[in-house]
Amino acid sequence: MWFKNCLVYRFNRDIDFNADQLEKQLEEFRFTPCGSQDKQKFGWVNAMGRHGDMMTHVSENRILICAKKEEKMLPASVIKDSLNAKVETLEAESGTPLKKKEKDSLKEDIIIDLLPRAFSRSNFTYALIMPKEGFIVVDASSYKKAEDVLALLRKTMGSLPVVPAIPEQAIETTLTEWVKSGDTPKGITMLDEAELKSIQEDGGIVRVKKQELEADEIKNHIEANKVVTKLLINWQDRIEFILAEDGSIKRLKFSDELKDENDDIPREDQAARFDADFSLLCGEFSVFLPNLFESLGGLTQPNA
């Protein structure tokens, strides 16, 4: 139970979370599979999957939830080919070209016909609610996916006063200062990967890997009006990650030392292992996230 990504939102006003009440609310929006004419379905599933029967999983008042989305796969090329063939046939029969409205109607008919036979794909997105710390952390690779989950949670609860957790100072400004000076806050270590982007609209992008970031070449890029927009960071020898200018935390990699703390639990006992790993994750995030935002200069103040 280890997150791979971290998109962090903060509460902009106090809100009480009751796990029992949330359990009932989530149940009302439980995921149901796509029917023959559904293009997609989105809802909540058991937090521990087949290893549990609760919609939530709780550790010291921190709540894990999981959303599932199922989408029917209808490639645009398949729809286009079917539409073109149908239009060709009808126009040949009538001797007159079809109007746009008629083509649009045909397209809808084709989609309705194809949906029952379409393959579907599913994906799961976890969210960690941390009331004490004031965060909701979504394990998503894009803000669009995270916002979809939060929109569903907002619909489920009736209200969800959260905003992206954004530092007072622009992240790219802070990252650039770190790389330029070689000086980072305690516990933060720059590694050997970064992205630098020109501040000019038509400027270039430089991506470096396995390269010393204190090298003159990197400093020259900064002197040439490039800013650091992504940086590979190690936090206290426990977590490695890429921090981007938009606040996204990706490629999370937890240290073997941390993950080995639960090695006394047999891997065959997946429910117990899930629970123990989740407790470790919560404990780590409760220190890591506040410390990271402090290192970045502190978060913007919520609206009064």
UniProtKB/Swiss-Prot annotation:
Taxonomy, superkingdom: Bacteria
Pfam family, one: RdgC
GO CC terms: bacterial nucleoid; cytoplasm
Localization per record: Cytoplasm, Nucleoid
GO MF annotation list: double-stranded DNA binding
Keyword annotations: Cytoplasm, DNA recombination
Main location group: cytoplasm
Family matches, as InterPro entries: RdgC (IPR007476)
A biological process term (GO) from this entry: DNA recombination
Entry keyword Membrane: no
Family: Belongs to the RdgC family.
Main function: May be involved in recombination.
Record-linked NCBIfam families: PRK00321.1-3, PRK00321.1-5
Name under which the protein is recorded: Recombination-associated protein RdgC
Annotated organism of origin: Vibrio atlanticus (strain LGP32) (Vibrio splendidus (strain Mel32))
